[in-house]
Amino acid sequence: LPCAEVTFRTAAAEESIRVISEAYPEMLVGAGTVLSVDQVKKAVAAGAKFIVSPGFDEEVVKYCLDNNIPVTPGVCTPSDVQKGYKMGLDVLKFFPAEPSGGLSMIKAIAAPYTMMKFIPTGGINENNMEDYLKYDRILAIGGSWMVKSSLVKSGEFEKIKEMSKTAVARVKEIRG
């Protein structure tokens, strides 16, 4: 994978970011599900190169912008997108994508914000990724279908590796 987002949902997040960053220096490793400035600081100290949050927290966004840390806050309404626009952002996470109306909702929200690109997450999988990736306002997609917790728990890392390779190859095929 060229890029990985480690979620800050567990106590192992910081150490995971550190280990991945050291083992794979060519990989762009970031922290996701970041809810506070304190978590931003911990993630960056561990080696995170970008921050993603599930919602739009102006304090987190401002801290990241003030410290030159790439940040992608989550949005799912035009009001959220407007906040991002006013703060100078041009890429936003659309979350949760599928439960919030999917690609048709993104297209509706994106229409007045012609400068904005989106990274949808939440319900993206191998069956719907192509539709998202074909829309020119989608910068990237996020998904965890290739890293299911059941595979991690059972130690099926080769399967995870193969599923990840397949996903990356599919993105390259769709995007050219």
Residue ranges and their predicted role:
Residues 36-46, 79-87, 124-139:
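Catalytic cores of alpha/beta
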Residues 1-24, 145-155:
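Glycine-rich, proline-tolerant flexible connector loops at the mouths of alpha/beta enzymes
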